[in-house]
Amino acid sequence: MLELKHITKVYEAGTTQVEALKGIDIAFRENEFVAILGQSGCGKTTLLNIIGGLDRYTSGDLIINGRSTKEYDDRDWDTYRNHSIGFVFQSYNLIPHQSVLANVELALTLSGVSGEERRARAVEALEKVGLGDQLDKAPNQMSGGQMQRVAIARAIVNNPDILLADEPTGALDSETSVQIMNLLQEIAKDKLIIMVTHNPELASKYATRTVRLLDGRIVGDDNPCTESETSAPVTVKVKEHTSMSFATAMSLSLHNLMTKKARTLLTAFAGSIGIIGIALILSLSHGFQSYINTV
């Protein structure tokens, strides 16, 4: 169970304060498709970022599986983001020089999963979104809808409890948008999906619950959690603290250097010129100083 109590968020710029969220109270069920609906600037993305642990609330409390996040340290937040949350954004954020499979594997690499298991789980996730035959393609060889499917596969490969989608169809045509929404609707059968959108048609057609935001406040909720649902016993899911090994980090770094040979060579060449230039200046300075001392 995910619950927000009296959440506020204030951004400060010098002496100016902007209150993005104003006392948000809402609870979410473990399996539902929630659409957060509102115009630009009403606080939708800020709310999504706080739920995903990408931003911190100013006051109030975010309660995850019965535990207050006021008790969370940085490792707890890392574990929450790595294992409990999947992110799907309007921009796909795929690495262009990596294959589709490698892009999906990356989420597991950062979680310290072994190579063999990484590949098996990444292939399974891509098959689930209908891209099992596109494993070796580069992102720039795919359509916008296919790239969004890759992003969804990357989001679900860690089997998160919650999937956060920020305008997932914003950059897609209407036909592709329907395909992506059908896919999200299927995933929502066993996960909590929270989708931010300004499109009421998408919300009414696909979501099981629509929450309306206006000026940082919830002004409508057509299927709120009942008191019995929020007070029900919570099953706490223990997540292990995991991290990428040093060997894996080095392997990724070397692979990145090798896939961008031209840039690596140019960077090394430019660095060499800089080092040689500094050495030459120091040598000339030392030579002039020695000459002056002997005159």
Name each region found by the language model.
Residues 67-68, 105, 109-112, 116-133:
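Conserved ABC ATPase "signature" region
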Residues 79, 138-148:
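Conserved ABC ATPase signature
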Residues 163-166:
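Catalytic Walker B motif of ABC-type/P-loop ATPase nucleotide-binding domains
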Residues 236-273:
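N-terminal Sec/SRP start-transfer signal
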